[in-house]
Amino acid sequence: MEAYSIFAEIYDRFMDNIPYDEWGKHITGILREYGIHSGLLCELGCGTGTMTRYLAGQGYDMIGTDISEEMLAKAREYETDGDILYLNQDMRELELYGTVQAVVSVCDSMNYIMTYDDLCLVLKKVNNYLESGGIFIFDMKTIHFYSSILADSVQVDNREDAAIIWENHYEVRSRIHNYELTMYIAVDDECYDTEYDEDECTDEYTDGRLYERYTECHSQKAYTIEEVKKAVKDAGMEFMAVYDEKTHNEPDENSERVYFIVREAYQKGKYYNV
């Protein structure tokens, strides 16, 4: 089953530990530091739109893009006034209606880019849609996080009407992290009214209640900081900064998530103000 298909139904419930407000305040501070106090922004890999809505609340006009239509459907459920434009797009095929002041991507969405060439492609796409001097702020999980924190662990998260088992496996040579999600979702809860494929779903009885079991496989890639810097250069962008998410200092061997700030740079043939 494709990543973020069934998981989209319970994503916000199980990701309630993500510090979106803290991240949002920090990103807003960066935007203002670079002179971006208003205007149109785009979030890549916006998921259910939590960060998109936060930035909209800070006075920015927002576009959210995501490869998962199921995640976007959830995002649209939260959107009551229709001010946010959500687009179902693979970030490697980013296509906007014009330029934006800045692009952001959080919650390790960029780790879903599985090859160096695709990383360069995404950066080129972003550069093409940034206004002159615009910035791209994104985070990435580190090699240390995948190899030493998650590694080959198994994690279980049990909630009132659903449970998830995360089975992790990190491939050292390729630096690819694979994880399989096994989800048990109560069928008598109207919040989880989803169609399912009989080949992907199994019924289970627990404490007299009927649960449906689903599986999804996800893969992410860990990059070195030097690889990202090189990709930024190869994409024709300008590298500005990288720092640890928690300390806001230069990353070290214990950093689990890092932020990158890169800036738009002129490309021959680029069409500004589309």
Predicted regions and their residues:
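SAM-dependent methyltransferase
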Residues: 137-231
